[in-house]
C-alpha cells in the first residue's frame, strides 16, 4: 500500500535534477513515534526528513516529493542527488544483561530475535520484515 502524507518539513528545496542514488536508513523507532518526531521536533522545522518510509507491514509512506530534497545529511550534494528511504526499524541493539530483551539507542525495548552483523562498534540489529523487503 502506498500513502502520501502532508509535507513534514518546510526545510525542503525546490525542484532539482534527476536523482543519482537511493540511500536506505532506519527510523530508530516505530513509525507513529517517528512521524510524530518529524512533525513536531523543533516546531516543525526538523530538517532530516526521508522521501519514503517503509513500515513493518509493508506500507510505503511518501513524505516528500521525489524532485525535492531535505537536509537529511550534512553534505549538500548527497541531499540534492539522493532519494532517502527509511525503514521502520529500531536499528542497532544492545542486549540487556540478565534479561530476555534488547534496547536501541533511545531505549526502545525489542523482544524478538536479533540479527548479528558487525558494523562499526555495533553487533546486533533488529531484522527487517519480509514484507518490508518486498515493498
Task: List each model region and its residues.
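Active-site-adjacent loop/helix surface patches within enzyme catalytic domains
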Residues: 2-135
Amino acid at each position: 500500500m502506498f500513502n502520501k502524507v502532508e509535507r513534514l518539513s518546510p526545510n525542503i528545496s525546490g525542484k532539482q535534477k534527476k536523482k543519482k542514488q537511493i540511500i536506505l536508513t532506519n527510523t530508530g523507532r516505530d513509525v507513529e513515534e517517528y512521524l510524530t518526531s518529524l512533525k513536531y521536533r523543533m516546531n516543525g522545522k526538523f530538517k532530516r526528513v526521508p522521501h519514503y518510509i517503509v513500515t513493518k507491514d509493508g506500507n510505503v509512506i511518501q513524505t516528500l516529493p521525489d524532485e525535492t530534497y531535505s537536509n537529511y545529511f550534512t553534505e549538500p550534494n548527497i541531499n540534492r542527488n539522493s532519494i532517502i528511504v527509511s525503514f521502520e526499524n529500531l536499528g542497532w541493539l544492545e542486549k540487556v544483561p540478565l534479561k530476555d530483551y534488547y534496547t536501541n539507542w533511545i531505549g526502545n525495548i525489542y523482544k524478538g530475535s536479533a540479527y548479528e552483523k558487525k558494523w562499526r562498534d555495533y553487533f546486533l540489529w533488529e531484522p527487517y520484515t519480509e514484507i518490508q523487503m518486498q515493498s
